[in-house]
From Swiss-Prot:
Protein's GO biological process: translation
UniProt-recorded name of the protein: Large ribosomal subunit protein uL3
Organism: Symbiobacterium thermophilum (strain DSM 24528 / JCM 14929 / IAM 14863 / T)
InterPro entries per UniProt: Ribosomal_uL3, Ribosomal_uL3_bac/org-type, Ribosomal_uL3_CS, Transl_B-barrel_sf
Subunit-structure text: Part of the 50S ribosomal subunit. Forms a cluster with proteins L14 and L19.
Source domain of life: Bacteria
Gene: rplC
An annotated Gene Ontology molecular function: rRNA binding
NCBIfam families: L3_bact (TIGR03625)
Length: 216
């Protein structure tokens, strides 16, 4: 069954495996998330659930969202995200989803907004090769030619210096090292996108699901 949860990145630490090896992990406060809305093929054309996460003062909720929460008779939340699922029959509006939907050893896909790094050149932003650093070189970190003579303009999509980071990034196939249901914590091996305190989305691994379907 497909599953997903919203969480907050708390930071990174390390734990010891039974064989004594150190494993770098990211600590995520996953849930509790409440099911705010359920969408079905009959009513909306596709199956999905809308999850709410995080506390928010009622004075900060605008009128359209306030009406949305009141319509479904759930408490207002800071974040709302939609998860497409094959089967939504087992979930109902008001159900609470916690970190224990995932187990140790599972593979997950994590999505977040990468940390903004400001204005960056082509070498840092696009991994361009740099020029000679020795005496007599006219360029060191310049991007070089931007195109041919014929068009006499820069084509769209050309890799140029600009703002780096602040984009939606998904890291595939990360392993769940530990789950603490009481504290709603999930420890994920390796780094996940985003700054401390940022919102991240955890879903079951797409590649693992495809491999399992192929094997069957």
């Amino acid at each position: 069954m497909q599953k997903g949860i919203l969480g907050k990145k708390l930071g990174m630490t390390q734990i010891f495996a039974p064989d004594g090896k150190i494993i770098p992990v990211t600590v995520v406060e996953a849930g509790p998330c409440v099911v705010v809305q359920k969408k079905t093929t009959a009513t909306d054309g596709y199956n999905a659930v809308q999850l709410g996460f995080g506390e928010i003062r009622e004075t900060l909720v605008n009128k359209p969202l306030k009406g949305h929460f009141e319509k479904h008779q759930v408490k207002a939340t800071r974040y709302l995200r939609e998860f497409r699922l094959d089967d939504v029959e087992s979930l109902n509006v008001g159900d609470v989803i916690k970190a224990d939907i995932f187990a140790e050893g599972e593979l997950v896909d994590v999505t977040g907004i990468s940390r903004g790094k400001g204005f960056a050149g082509g070498v840092k932003r696009w991994n361009f090769n740099r020029g000679p650093s020795s005496h007599g070189s006219k360029y060191h970190r310049r991007p070089g030619s931007l195109g041919q003579r014929r068009w006499a303009r820069v084509p769209k999509g050309r890799k140029l210096p600009g703002r780096l980071g602040g984009e939606r990034v998904t890291v595939l196939g990360l392993r769940v090292v530990k789950v603490d249901p009481e504290k709603n914590l999930i420890l994920i091996k390796g780094a996940v996108p985003g700054a401390k305190g940022s919102l991240i989305t955890i879903r079951d691994s797409v590649k693992a699901a495809r491999a399992k379907a192929k094997a069957q």
